[in-house]
A protein has these predicted regions:
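Hot-dog-fold acyl-thioester-processing enzymes
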Residues: 2-68, 124-149
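Well-ordered beta-strand positions in beta-sheet-rich domains
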Residues: 16-18, 102, 114-118
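Generic serine detector
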Residues: 22, 96-98, 102, 113, ...
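Hydrophobic beta-strand-centered segment that forms part of the acyl-chain substrate-binding groove
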Residues: 48-98, 112-113, 119-120
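Core beta-strand residues in small-molecule sensory/regulatory alpha/beta domains
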Residues: 104-106
Length: 149
């Protein structure tokens, strides 16, 4: 990804997450309808956590969850029916109670969309936000984008 709004995702700190596209996600123009990209980001986040060593189910078992508080995307080109999608995921920022992930939706080496999402850590008992736990912080720090190191 390039441009001032997104840090460059560096292969050494990204986790590629394959995403299966489905027929129902395509519109009359034969491309993935734009709302699906946000669902893909969330799906990629849960797969990303598993890949880096703290599966979403373990986070929940520890009494924690995450809530999306901000998301954004820039479209560069369409994903067309039958194309294989991979989303590169990297940690952009880690705060005291939140973290930001960057996403690059690509087909082959071509980035079709880029985005970011801010998640806040919350307690599963409904008592509110919590500090990013040490285990989660550790796996996120291992994938901080080079722009943030």
């Amino acid at each position: 990804m390039t441009g001032p709004d997104y840090p460059k995702l560096v292969a050494a700190v990204t986790v590629p997450v394959p995403i299966a596209t489905s027929y129902f996600q395509y519109d009359q123009q034969g491309v993935v309808f734009n709302m699906w990209y946000f669902g893909w980001f969330d799906d990629a986040m849960t797969q990303f956590l598993g890949e880096v060593g703290y599966p979403y189910t373990a986070l929940n078992a520890d009494g924690l969850d995450v809530q999306l508080v901000h998301t954004e995307a820039d479209w560069r080109d369409a994903v067309r029916y039958g194309e294989q999608v991979v989303i590169d995921v990297a940690t952009e920022r880690i705060g005291s109670t939140s973290f930001t992930l960057s996403f690059a939706v690509r087909v082959g080496e071509q980035v079709r969309s880029a985005g970011r999402t801010v998640y806040v850590v919350v307690s599963t008992d409904g008592s509110g936000k919590r500090p990013v736990p040490p285990k989660l912080r550790g796996v996120l720090e291992a994938t901080l984008t080079e722009a943030r190191r």
